[in-house]
Design a protein with these regions (language model features):
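Signature of N-terminal electron-transfer/Fe-S-associated modules in redox systems
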Residues: 1-65
Length: 65
């Protein structure tokens, strides 16, 4: 089980480290998967909001790969 505070803090660090990249979604998802071994469901809305994308769009990329 993920500790919510630590999880969200670490997730936001990962997102911030990739925001300046062109097309940061895949690098963020790869980093998240590297950190936790998968992309946790609670990460999807946080990533979507940070990138100004819809949750469905992020979920679609996660489920495709």
């Amino acid at each position: 089980m993920l500790d919510t505070v630590d999880f969200e803090s670490r997730l936001r660090e990962i997102i911030a480290a990739h925001l300046a990249m062109e097309g940061p979604l895949l690098p963020i998802l790869h980093a998240v998967q590297h950190e936790w071994g998968h992309v946790p469901e609670p990460a999807i809305p946080v990533i979507a909001e940070a990138l100004n994308l819809g949750r469905a769009e992020v979920h679609g990329v996660v489920s495709f790969y």
